[in-house]
Amino acid sequence: MTFMQANKKRTGWIGTLLLLIFHTGMAQSPTNTPLAPMSLTAKEAVDYALANQATVRNAKLDELIQLAKNKEVSGMALPQLSGAGSFQHNPIVQKQLIDASNFSDTVPKGTLVPFAFGLKFNVLGEVKFSQVLFDPSVLVALQARKTLEELSHRGVQKAEIDVKVNVYKSYYNVLSARKALTILRGNLTTLEKLLGETRETYKNGLVEKLDVDRLVVQLTNLRTEEIKLQNLSEVGLAALKYSMGMPMKQELTLTDTLSLAEIKSAVAVEKFDYSQRIEYQLLESQKKAYEYDLKRYKYNALPILSLFGTGGVSRASDVFNYFDNQTWYGYVGYGVNLSFNIFTGFQRKRKVDQAFLQVKKTEVSIEDAKLGIDLEQTQSTSNLRNNIVALEAQESNMQLAQEVYNTTQIKYKEGVGSSVEMSNAENDLLTAQNNYFTALYNASVSRIDYLKAYGKL
């Protein structure tokens, strides 16, 4: 592929990305048009966020800025052409004293006379040309373009991964709260029915008022818990919309479900390389950028060679008659410039030292990142395994608590069970349900952390 073909391809890609960002921004502009309801899976919510979330959009704009800077650097190696023009009016022309005896033997030495070395009206038009033949700083800047593009692109990838983590966790948080709310409302329906039956039984004198009061207290507690879960669900949904870059007024339905089977679907990673982690990739790219800095300071000892050329026309007179057909005087000049540093007070050496140490510092950061990744993988693997075990246990425990509650309810209706047993069974069921949903959310979050730790998100 030629340079021109690559440039056209890149320009087309930039235009497409700009159009996408512009379209996204327009789509989010405030409008009076009602927003159509949306139904999204967790994956679709992530895709929406990658197109609309402000952090990702800014990262993409930063990438475009870097591409524009790279084109600016490319322009430094191209010919530079500039033009200038001036008009000057001298109502009083500056005079200088000269010895008139230099121009005539008849004039006594030391005879000073004023003499004007200019005219009242002066016009100048000039064009300047320059071309770098060799400049070490320009050479290194051209070589570093690809690395800087890579660095900015990986910044976009890092932003996308962070957004994915936030969206997935927010999505599953809402699902967990809503699932808990659904089961709680089922408990409310059952308890309301039981309270109605108990009141009828109380009217017939078969149970005490204390039994009715206990059920009323339980019902009130459940309704209070329902309000809390409803608020948690609404706030969680608002947080999800924010993490997606979605307007708060947008009606959103979550279509995914939370299940143990889905959480277990996180496939064990058989082979892992640190380059799969975006944080490691960013540090590697940053190291390359610092190495180019080091190279630039080293090359500053080399000379700078460039071509230059100047051409122009001028005219001067004591009368403003530039529209008359009179002679303009042209001039042309060209040459080569060569410059180099002989002694800079050891400044270049100190800059080289600093750049070298910066490279070493990045190498230390890379080694530390490897250790951090190892720790993160160990923790995430252990957390996922333990949370799956806890979820399985809590799921069985909740089912058992439900069976105990159902049996206790039957005994209570048949008059062979007490209200105390009923209250205890209700509390045990609520505790088991809360523990289950906590375990469900923890397992879902640990799955996301596990995938992120292995660069699979």
Task: Give the predicted meaning of each segment.
Residues F3-R10, Q28-L35, V46, S82, ...:
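Acidic, low-complexity, intrinsically disordered peripheral segments
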Residues Q5, L40, A68, E160-Y274, ...:
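Periplasmic alpha-helical coiled-coil/stalk elements that build and connect Gram-negative outer-membrane
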Residues I14-T24:
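Bacterial N-terminal signal peptides
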Residues A27-S86, I92-V93, M248, L254-E291, ...:
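Bacterial Sec-pathway N-terminal export signals of envelope proteins
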Residues S29-M38, A84-K128, T257-K264, F308-F340:
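Small/polar, glycine/serine/threonine/aspartate-rich low-complexity segments that form flexible
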Residues R57-L61, S74, L133-E160, L210, ...:
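Sec/SRP-type N-terminal targeting helices
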Residues K71, K128, D293-R296, N337-S339:
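Outer-membrane beta-barrel architecture
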Residues T224-M246, Q399-K456:
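Short segments within alpha-helical structural elements
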